[in-house]
Amino acid sequence: EDVDKPTSLNHLSFRVKTFDEVQEVKERLDSIDVQYLPLCHGNALSLYFNDPEGNGLEVFFDTPWDVAQPQGVVWDTNLTEKEALEWVERTFENEPKFAKREESDREFVNRK
């Protein structure tokens, strides 16, 4: 097999349990001057960045909502968790299928 052959892998994603963990990653990236893209999909607050070899990475925290995808809006990483979640709700509440996760009618949203 040709190990140098490009793959279709775009990035690796890592779910964290708390908003504070996203903030910890942000602070670490800031401390070592790594650029990142803070992107909100409505259902998650994410940080996208590259590792030293250029592989795409995402660290994300689930929001309490489900939103039809694709979505992507840059979010302010200086917000507190409460402010960020209020911003998410205001930003995405008029999008198709916006609902609390537990009320979502999409089967895969609440799978464990």
Question: Where does each model-flagged region fall?
Answer:
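Zn2+-dependent peptidoglycan hydrolase active-site motif and core
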Residues: D2
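Vicinal oxygen chelate
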Residues: K5-T7, L12-G56, F61-V67, L79-R111
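Polybasic, low-complexity binding patches
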Residues: Q71-T77
